[in-house]
Amino acid sequence: ITADHYREVLFSSSRTARVGRAFLNSTIISGGSVALVLVTSAMAAYPLARMRFPGRNLIFAALVGSLMVPNVVTLVPQYLLVQQLGWLSTFQGLIVPEAGVALAFGVFLLRQFFLGIPAELEDAARIDGANAWQIFTRIILPLSHPALAALSIFAFRSAWNDFLWPLIAV
């Protein structure tokens, strides 16, 4: 038994066997989507969880409401936007919309996790002279590794399993 057939499928340059290139493209798109989701979700969830500002609950309600809209409903507007930006058949044209699919869930998940972190830790940091960015990056994010890991798994799986958007956008 040899691995010649696997080598042929994964590393062949023929048109019929480009599995290696497809795997690499899927990995780039899924990984880029995860990175974008982690950064944007964390930065959006922190103010929703910890800062007091007018309309905070309305924004969160709209975010939760957007989770109830099926992704298929947004395909045509998404396509038109990506087309106007000139992103069709590009990595950013696949990564940014894929991240948008998981963004609302990511903000919801991280906001709920941030609410569970004791506010006294932030108060102590403020007394020590930390600003909001330092509190976020040096206290909240290090404590959020479990939630960020879970979000990474969900976002990666969502991007990896998406077939319809790449079929339309490429």
Regions found by a protein language model. Give the residues of each.
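A structural signal for multi-pass alpha-helical bundles of membrane permease subunits
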Residues: 1-170
